[in-house]
Amino acid sequence: MHVRPTLALPAAALAATLTLTSCADANGSDDGAFTFGLLYPQSGSLAFLAPPQIAAVDYAISLINDAGGVLGTEVPPPVQADEAGDNAQANEAANTLVNDGVNAVIGAASSSMTQATYDTITGSEITQCSGSSTSPELSEIDDGGYFFRTAPSDLMAGPVLAQRIIADGHTSVAIVARADDYGTGYLTAVEDELNALGAEVTLSETYDPDTTNFGAVIDGVFRAEADAIALISFEEGTQLMAALIETEVDSTFYLTDGLNDPGLDETIADRRPDAIVGTTGVAPSADNPAFNEGLRAFAPDLDVFQFAPQIFDCVTVIALAAEAADSTDPRVYVEHLPDVSRPAGTECTSFAECRDLLDQGQDIDYQGASGDIDFDDNGDPTSATFEVFHFGRDGYEILDYVDYSSRED
């Protein structure tokens, strides 16, 4: 579980401040420009998320610099490091960012890579914020209070997907998921909600993400005879979907953010263009046309926008925390991160607007590009917006946006 750092030193430990100061360069110094590190997948199954992550970070920094930078100093381009979807390489990349003395790390992309790197980053007392890691297990990590995320936990996403399945009239569901932090947490959330809604879960099964043989899974799904199939996967899920379609399984597919790809119908159904017509999915998103238009203007070649609002918010909310603390040192500004997104403050929607309110001595409630973040004590957002995407006869479309909150009213 998160433990918030205690930053004040007792008198008896005053001498230790000399040591602490000497280590400043290793954990984000307070000596000028605020430098972001970006830990993202240039290769691997989530490499398609790299372009929107880079664009969102650069876009956020450009708006911060247009407003005068952080504490009046221009923010330099982010230090980039490739986590490649591999634990060893991710740790090497995280160490590179730590040794470069960045003031904050944005990333990693997947929950597994965040699990593999948070100890290196937060253990060095550097703030880490992921805009796309959604595993519920990340709410319970021992990070000293330095890990935050703007992507909602799958404990929110699971119920939204389950409710959509039931709303579409299905009463029996087969759930298949990756056997990793992302897949198992999401599966549990979906299954619990389906059970609560009175649906019959005829199959609940995980598979090795590195497998190339889905025979046992396909057999299990076929025997489950469910109305709907909830598939919780990344890129490898296209192979499983294609194989299930070949067996002519008579079920409707429901997907998660890992397969939120407008070109999925072309990837899977070369021989049967209508094979995934009717497929629906749920993914964290933002019902924010103004942000989307701004990002398109900033990065006109960008064609994947998934998690871009959440990544943008990681950068912006950290910069605002530094402004509120009057410090770029993560050991100082980290305690202000929850405060700049709390409902007790004055609502504001941009770095410039929020910074000006802080300069006037006001508390702020940053309303992010992805929605009202409102971090809880675990560094998780307590509200989120999800898009319901769909493949119809005319191709990919967004059917609806669903707001979900974990707050107890």
Question: Which residues are covered by each model-predicted region?
Answer:
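Extracytosolic ligand-binding ectodomains
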Residues: 2-10, 17-409
